[in-house]
Amino acid sequence: MDQDIKTVIQYPVGATEFDIPFDYLSRKFVRVSLVADDNRRLLSNITEYRYVSKTRVKLLVETTGFDRVEIRRFTSASERVVDFSDGSVLRAADLNVSQLQSAHIAEEARDSALMAMPQDDAGNLDARNRRIVRLAPGIDGTDAINKNQLDTTLGEAGGILSDMKDLEGEIHDYIEKFADDTSVVRGVAWVYNLGSANGGENVITINKPTRTYAVPYIEVNGSRQEVGYHYQFDLNTQSISLVKPLEKGDFLMAMTTESSVPLESMLASAAGASSVGKLGGGTVQDFITNTESKFGSFSVLEDFGPVGTPEDTAATLLSSLSSGKPIVLTRMYSLPMRTFSIPSGTTLIGLGAKTGFKAAGGTELFVNLLEVGGTDVLLSNFAITMDAAGRGSVGSVACYGVHFLASSRGNRAQGLKITGKAVGSTVGFTHGVRCNGVRNVVDKCDIQYCSMGITLRGEYHKITNNYLNNHYVDENLGPWTAASMFWDGITGEGCINCEISGNISEYNGQSGIYFGGNNSLSQGLIITNNICRYNYNRGCDTGISGTASDTNNVIDVTYSSNILENNRETNLWLFGVSESTLIGNHIRETALYDTLFPNQASTTRAGLALGGLTCNNNEIVGNNIRVRSTTPFGIVLNGTGHYLAANRRIGGASNYIFASDNQRLVGNSIERYTGSFTPTLVGTAGINVTSATGRYEIQRNVLTVEINMTLSANGATGAIAIGYIPGLSSVTPVMRDIKVTLLNGWLPALGDKTILAREGTSNDLLNLVVFSYGNQSNEVAQYVGPASSLRITATFNTSATL
């Protein structure tokens, strides 16, 4: 039997283009995925990969976290490629396609069977060294068991703790509860039967060395149960009577109020770990020792020295960083405004926004408060406050909160709250995070009052789920100038294959997101699912400075599914950018715009704009553009080679694409653009135009025109030429499907003669001719009466190559 898998292939990551080795009937039957042993991501055509040819695809996304690219054919069994109807003509090609679809479905079914869990030669099921997932718990003695059952059997109780920070925090909580009352201990957790019920129990007894006075509530498998409704507590017997019996394996935790015993004795007792809500029993020290052996020990900063003055804290921080241990920050520490270098492998974790560092003083510029030049550094869950007190400028930065240097690789700033202004002070020129190097991550950071929130340069960075606001707009700081301390939320130059997604950037002094050349090359950027609103300049601003070249350019950028709202100037702006895709973005102006920017000139406003002569070959598809009535354009179009399709536009001026008709028709490929014009008579004497209207539609390089005119004359002679047809002045059109309809009012002398339209003396003119019995004449004016109406419809193909 043929055992080859023919409809699925996996390639190792590392390349960007991959062959499709099988035939298929439709691209929608081909699925491209990124695959790892424990993860799978199905990619979307156009936005995450595209077809280079019928047999080859190109990835548009980063493959970090995955080791294989899978291409699979999955032919629909319900969506027929060919649908036969009674009475129709059967063609061999249709029958072949229908038979091929059935063959593809059968071939894919065979491959699925081969890829499932087969039997070996002895009849045993063979997992072929792969994990078996979603395995139900075993019941009978011969059943397979899953890892959770094994962990419970071995006493690991389902994963006790992720790190020492949780343990320390919970112990502190219980210490505070002990300190509240010297006679009674409140809020002590007790876990029944080491965290796993036997099953069937409806009465359980609290067997603790201290007397329990009350049980305010219990939790069963994380579901809170209320006293008097779900259970009763008997003080005399120290028992809990449940309305619903426990099931086997249930986790029951009771929150108790009990008599006090010395804290040291309780924590050192055999039930000490259980007393603070941990499974498995044993003393707290036993639990700490066991956890350290699994996860490594954490230390608090104070373990390494005094933290009273900024200089004390500086020395202690340096000492802790040289220890090689993960450091926990338990409060806000004052530091001098100077650079602190973080070694590779350091983990620096806070306990939230009320822990971290506040730096002030000094006169130095270009301070890197937390400087990372190596690898595998984690900065997580703490605050940084920089008090630069008005120092610095855009070219002389006072301080960077976190600076990943060009030598850095694979570091992470996560959950940081970074503020560029101390209470009562003024803003100096600061960057929240400066991200250079390769494959660094800035995630879920809250960055406010920094001149620039996040700035980046390098390769494969991920800037995700951050909040950026320097409060220039919402605090009404006046007209912006280049000397301002308030710039963009996210700024990138010289960025390759970076992802900027899920960020909110608002109220900034310049743009929400800016990427530019500035003598550098940026390409392969994925900018998606961001919200950029209320910014003083633009929502998303991408462009080059100076002359475009191989080393000074912005190319191959994908803007998708972003929300760009009420930004002062153009919401989505590309200047000199080429080979890029703008798809599915939501651009809107609301009544709030007039409140935020009441005096803004309409000439600087548009929903989406492409500018510059080097702005070429971009795709603008499926964008939703809603602008105010005072905004003149939904789309501004400069450059050539662009493809525009399925963009929805509401509001603004009627001429929603600002461009010449020649640009719309010839220089670019535009789907279903409609417009109007006023036709005139050219070089014709003795005839008056009573009324004239013209409508046209551009569908790529095809122009469809309808002209309606009413003419009046008395004894006129000569030819009639009508112009000017939009977009045709500089091209040689091929006219087809032309029709002249004489509506009424033509003189009887016309008789059975026919009036036709022919190409005029220039590309954008039509000449009317009289045709009769094979003879053609230009003498048409003699048949025009006091009110002669006609309609002309025509279709033109341009000869230009798009």
UniProtKB/Swiss-Prot annotation:
InterPro entries: PbH1 (IPR006626), Pectin_lyas_fold (IPR012334), Pectin_lyase_fold/virulence (IPR011050), Phage_T7_tail_fibre-like_N (IPR005604)
Domain notes per entry: The N-terminus anchors the RBP to the virion. The central part and C-terminus probably binds and degrades the host exopolysaccharides.
The protein's name in its UniProt record: Depolymerase, capsule KL47-specific
Oligomeric and partner information: Homotrimer.
A cellular component term, taken from the record's GO annotations: virus tail
A Pfam family it matches: Phage_T7_tail
Keywords, sorted A to Z: Degradation of host capsule during virus entry, Degradation of host cell envelope components during virus entry, Host-virus interaction, Viral attachment to host adhesion receptor, Viral attachment to host cell, Viral tail protein, Virion, Virus entry into host cell
